């Protein structure tokens, strides 16, 4: 037991409709998939650990909870937290995070989604994620070494608005990018990202609409190429829309090769970008067009 809760180890895929109870702490060991057609229901305030370390049987080489396309999540408030090999909470991100896979055609690393399969459905009122993902130790400023694969905290892959219904997403101290949205179009009411190892929001040929709250704190560290927004156009244009009357709090380097259209947010400069306020004068857009797909340095 820990935190007065029983430890339940999860080693294999979730193949039947399952309930996670808040009297337990569930530990994800290796690559655990919630299979297509299967629903995972999580009681309010349940804690789920993602175990750190190398797992050779995982296609990602680390632990991850992956909701396959066609699977379902039903939750109120849930906590995803990194843990060590002794099932203790860890402040070192060394895992592959949590993945939500929809039914739009998409691929990231070894994980694919397929168009035309049973729709996914992911609902949670609040998700808190701490120390998810992993960072390459050589990816430091002025390093001449080539970084190897790293892992993001939360990945949204091939999802549409009908599939992704997470209302509040809080990601703190992620190992790589905090939230990676790939070939998706989703709306999230509230987003909070605090001190990711790299970018706060990585948007790859996707659209993201933020409705009520957008708080992104990417304080300066010795890691190079670390931005508030990393907008990529590998498979088509990408943009972020911030709705009118959204509370916005941004700190960090804005991000290159992006365009900001806003009557509220000031235009980014080369240095530290700071903004705190409400978008009272209309919607704001941050985008990059595929036609301008320059190769990154």
Regions found by a protein language model. Give the residues of each.
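Extracellular beta-rich repeat passengers
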Residues: 1-297
């Amino acid at each position: 037991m820990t935190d007065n809760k029983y430890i339940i180890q999860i080693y294999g895929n979730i193949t039947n409709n399952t309930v996670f109870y808040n009297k337990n702490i569930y530990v994800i060991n290796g690559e655990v998939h919630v299979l297509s057609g299967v629903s995972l229901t999580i009681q309010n305030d349940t804690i789920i650990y993602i175990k750190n370390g190398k797992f050779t049987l995982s296609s990602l080489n680390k632990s991850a909870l992956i909701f396959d396309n066609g699977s379902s999540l039903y939750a109120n408030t849930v906590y995803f937290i990194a843990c060590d090999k002794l099932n203790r909470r860890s402040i070192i991100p060394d895992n592959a995070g949590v993945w939500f896979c929809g039914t739009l055609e998409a691929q990231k690393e070894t994980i694919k989604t397929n168009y035309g399969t049973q729709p996914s459905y992911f609902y949670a009122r609040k998700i808190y994620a701490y120390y998810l993902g992993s960072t390459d130790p050589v990816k430091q400023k002025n390093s001449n070494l080539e970084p190897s694969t790293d892992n993001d905290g939360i990945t949204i892959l091939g999802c549409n608005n009908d599939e992704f219904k997470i209302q509040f997403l809080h990601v703190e101290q992620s190992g790589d990018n905090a939230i990676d949205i790939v070939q998706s179009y989703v709306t999230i009411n509230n987003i909070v990202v605090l001190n990711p190892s790299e970018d706060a929001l990585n948007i790859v040929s996707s659209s993201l609409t933020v409705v009520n709250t957008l708080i992104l704190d990417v304080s300066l560290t010795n890691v190079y190429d670390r931005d508030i927004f990393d907008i990529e156009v590998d498979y088509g244009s990408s943009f972020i829309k911030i709705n009118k009357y959204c509370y916005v709090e941004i700190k960090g380097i804005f991000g290159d090769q992006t365009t900001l259209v806003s009557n509220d947010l000031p235009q980014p400069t080369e240095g530290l970008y700071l903004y705190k306020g409400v978008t009272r004068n209309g919607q704001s857009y941050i985008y990059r067009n595929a036609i301008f797909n320059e190769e990154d340095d």
